[in-house]
Amino acid sequence: FSMQPRFLWACILLLCAEVTPGQELTQWIDDNCADCLEKMETLTGARILEQGEEALVGRAWLTRNAQQSIDVQYFIWSTDNVGTLAAEQLLRAAERGVAVRVLVDDLLIDAQGQSLLLLSAHPNVEIRIYNPNDTVGTSFYARIKNVFTQFRSLNQRMHDKTAIYDGVAGITGGRNMADEYFDFDPNYNFRDRDILLLGPAVSAMQENFEEFWSSSFAIPVEEILDSTVATITPADAALKAAELHAYAENPDNFGPEVQQAIAHLSERIPKLLSQMSWQDVEFISDAPGKNDGSQGLGGGGQSTNRLFEAVRNAKHSVLIQSPYLILPKGGIELFKELSERGVRIRISTNSLASTDNVPAFSGYHRQRPRLLNAGVELFEFKPHPGIQSKLIARYPSLAGNNPIFAIHAKSMVVDDELIFIGTFNLDPRSANLNTEVGVVIQSKELARQLTRSIERDMLPENSWHTTGEFSPDYEVSRGKRLELGFVNLLPVEPLL
């Protein structure tokens, strides 16, 4: 484990220790925000979480203070510092009586099956795996077989990212549960974005979780690994819990900066509440499975329809930030139609130099001339943007590693008043295969905030402005350009 995540989690644990155990989450909200509970009866409070550290602190604080239930749904849950310590915090919540349910997609799960069983052995913890046909409990032979016999199913993933606390507070957005999504990887971090919610939209988020949890796609880990369950003893589960707690409580894991930072951490959560913007919030989601599969790798979905509707109705401007930019069928034509109507379209995305996904970039690379001809303004993020010290307050301590930054936020502003923040990438996979979630909000205030953030990422010191005469593709090694050239030859666009 590296020192920087230890430093943050030390702060989180000390912050949590300052809160009165057993205090109801709603009561704490009422005590620290005089009119929040009254507003929550009809409106949803929303606070955009731009920085990884505040997004992580918010999750940790809510996990520590939930009293009844915590329901989390993620595409990726790593076994790195953030993933391990997040699991420890959930286990700690379960030990004080909170019902914890975890739903994770099967494709990119890091944890070994036995570790999952040891955690789910706690009576207050349930773990289910979405569409388990690749990793958990799947042999190498079965995995190869599934490529040929269940190709669409293998590619249909749950890309949702939600965390719900006592049915009162919720967080959704682009961040998975791993170091690089919270600015705590020393070498590569994502420029990401979440949104914290209080109020009716959280009820809609909860309904979506229940639909996925009870669907035929969500399989209890004990059912997947039934042959291993019998080998798990209470002593094994207790040892696993003790190991997690020992790591979290070991002062040797904490950096010397903790005492200085703790005085400020305790002020953060009330400050987040004071910065809430209150309005109607529409939570959008897909049904489990995305669609009925009758159109193969196509078919669209509820989230696809809603977002394309928002773009189609634009009157004067569309501003998009997406890590991957491969428009599905009809997308470029729609942008051209909008541009001809006088709608200004600007998109912030990754460059070849910053991207973590060369195959996805290849799809964008092929479409880029057509996007430019359609009137779209393109801004490609630099791997070492000038903004990096503002994204991460502790950047000076990382500078020696020269870390790469890449966009992972999925956001949109239409006509300076409608925003989207969620999990939807502007690519065929999000449009047709992966289930997605997010929020659509009509708010000039939040639109101004989000526009400022994206436009800052598009400044010359942070992004290259790609045109028909200039692209930054040569700002990378020859090896990466050769990789791009090879991938460009493959017919994989529907899967990107």
Regions found by a protein language model. Give the residues of each.
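Sec-dependent N-terminal signal peptides
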Residues: 7-16
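Charged, low-complexity intrinsically disordered terminal segments
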Residues: 17-161, 165-496
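Positively charged n-region of N-terminal signal peptides that target proteins for export
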Residues: 2-6
